[in-house]
Amino acid sequence: MRTNPTTSRPGVSTIEEKSVGRIDQIIGPVLDITFPPGKLPNIYNALIVKSRDTADKQINVTCEVQQLLGNNRVRAVAMSATDGLMRGMEVIDTGTPLSVPVGGATLGRIFNVLGEPIDNLGPVDTSATFPIHRSAPAFIELDTKLSIFETGIKVVDLLAPYRRGGKIGLFGGAGVGKTVLIMELINNIAKAHGGVSVFGGVGERTREGNDLYMEMKESGVINEKNIEESKVALVYGQMNEPPGARMRVGLTALTMAEYFRDVNKQDVLLFIDNIFRFVQAGSEVSALLGRMPSAVGYQPTLSTEMGSLQERITSTKKGSITSIQAVYVPADDLTDPAPATTFAHLDATTVLSRGLASKGIYPAVDPLDSTSTMLQPRIVGNEHYETAQRVKETLQRYKELQDIIAILGLDELSEEDRLTVARARKIERFLSQPFFVAEVFTGSPGKYVGLAETIRGFQLILSGELDGLPEQAFYLVGNIDEASTKAINLEEESKLKK
């Protein structure tokens, strides 16, 4: 005789003993589950399905409660594939939201949305865990002082400075140096600020995630020999994952970053690649839960979901989380609800230009398209602001003159315009910089340039004091003194060739 799988002995239900429910309905990644009266789980509680499928293979699926339907039924979204699940299977209510490991033991490791390591390096050596659903810091805890987050990268610090505890949008196509810029920022925050980084791969390609991991190992950001000395923790929810995982993986990464800020009192850099995929996953889940779609088919709760994530990324009196978010703009339409909602939260934008990358100028940050709310005299000071504005004016004038140069040549320009072009070309090259993480590829030692040194360098170029130096002297150097030294070396080399 076949026994009911939900009872352990006649007349006594294990559902009532263990506070477990039964699967009623499965539609893709969405499960409807019935619980005993009075034993309903709370919204966002984690539910676990542990069983065996028809091939006697172990099933272990974690779900998150999204809706209470009435009649003791809840609707949950699975965080992994629902293959092999059947009606009638037992579902255990954990009584708490999804919790993930936090702390120093997470550095150098790769996790999935559930906080399980997926790098084949064994379990994580930590007992500390945090729930992924947490409140944003209270107003009284926030640090209201506006301060610049120095990155040591000249073009960023001068023209589009980052705010400590701010949010930065990183716009760039494939092959313009986005990954290298991300790795350099991770490296510099570790060295200059004693901080750590968390990278959240939200709905990205598995190949790109793997490439990033390999490049981090190669450049030393992840230390294979001594994993505790690594500077970054990685959390991945790839494109092939169910929408529930892609929707929550950003929160998993953010939770790990919050521990470093609140408990270790550190400055943390949080990378989210790509924030659009977070919105996209939320849209899929919303449709699966039967909600009426809003504009352009997005979820009606788009602003709420984005706000609940972004409001947790902030500076407190203990430390800061500075977030750099790659933003995909669908069909290059900036009015699309997903990027438009993201822009409302950003303090700065860093735009990577294919034109600059093709000239070999790295980092290929576009000095005219990149913006920052921090570039104001009352925040950065008059000297910084005026230098940045003069640099932008010179580059803008050069851009306007390029058509004339292409048709008539440099000789047809006025003396003043020729001087502007010469200085703009020097500025363009001086905005390039050798990176620490690219040392293994270029052979040039990396350079960290402080903000004061950066301002001094550009002031000297704008004042005309360095008009006699060749353009090549400004290419891939750190501070302005290195450009002068390089000019002397170039002169000596040319004499030797003669």
From Swiss-Prot:
Show the disulfide pairing.
none
Query: Coiled-coil annotation: which residues?
Result: none
Q: Name one GO biological process term.
A: proton motive force-driven mitochondrial ATP synthesis
The protein's superkingdom reads Eukaryota
Q: Where in the cell is it found?
A: Plastid, Chloroplast thylakoid membrane
Q: How does it sit in the membrane?
A: Peripheral membrane protein
What are the annotated GO cellular component locations? chloroplast thylakoid membrane; mitochondrion; proton-transporting ATP synthase complex
Under catalytic activity, the entry for this protein gives:
ATP + H2O + 4 H(+)(in) = ADP + phosphate + 5 H(+)(out)
EC class of this enzyme? translocase
HAMAP family given for it? Answer: ATP_synth_beta_bact (MF_01347)
In Swiss-Prot or TrEMBL terms, this protein is called ATP synthase subunit beta, chloroplastic
Q: Which gene encodes it?
A: atpB
